[in-house]
Amino acid sequence: MYVEMIDETGQVSEEIKKQTLELLDFAAQKLGKKDKEMAVTFVTNERSHELNLEYRDTDRPTDVISLEYKPELDITFDEEDLAENPELAEMMGEFDSYIGELFISIDKAREQAEEYGHSYEREMGFLAVHGFLHINGYDHYTPEEEAEMFGLQEEILTAYGLTRQ
């Protein structure tokens, strides 16, 4: 999985960036999404607040904002068209590979790590996986959805080695 990583804060360590890349790749393999692309931007609470207001109409900072990429146009070609035009096939493959972007508030991650009594590394990993699952269609609006999403999220974090400490 290709992840474009941007640190708007200038405060995220190389270890956290590496962990985030590895964890997202691990989660992508688990979901069969290893050939996909996404972006992760680390932000402050102030920036998170702005984004939350812009995209979710919620006037407060949040820990992670997940923006799933859904192309406006549903473009399909039959196998014959793609076989006759290899450049088109390649272009469509690239078009389908981008799945979305995450904005992770490092301030919220620190606050929540302290509040929940685990490490900052664990919280950053949790937020990355949580956001990644949202981008891939998981949600927690109903008890059933929550059980499925939170179960998968815990399974990924535990298998990766980021347990609650």
UniProtKB/Swiss-Prot annotation:
Q: Which Pfam families match?
A: YbeY (PF02130)
**Principal EC category:** hydrolase
The EC number(s) attached to this protein equal 3.1.-.-
Provide one Gene Ontology biological process annotation: rRNA processing
UniProt: Zn(2+) binding residues: H130, H134, H140
- What is the required cofactor set for this protein? Zn(2+)
GO CC: one term? cytoplasm
Query: Is the Cell membrane keyword given for this protein?
Result: no
Q: Which UniProt keywords apply?
A: Cytoplasm, Endonuclease, Hydrolase, Metal-binding, Nuclease, Ribosome biogenesis, rRNA processing, Zinc
Record localization: Cytoplasm
Q: How is the cofactor bound?
A: Binds 1 zinc ion.
Give GO MF terms, alphabetically.
Answer: metalloendopeptidase activity; RNA endonuclease activity; zinc ion binding
The entry assigns this protein to a family as follows:
Belongs to the endoribonuclease YbeY family.
Name used for this protein in its record: Endoribonuclease YbeY
Species name: Streptococcus thermophilus (strain ATCC BAA-250 / LMG 18311)
Q: What is the lineage of its organism?
A: Bacteria, Bacillati, Bacillota, Bacilli, Lactobacillales
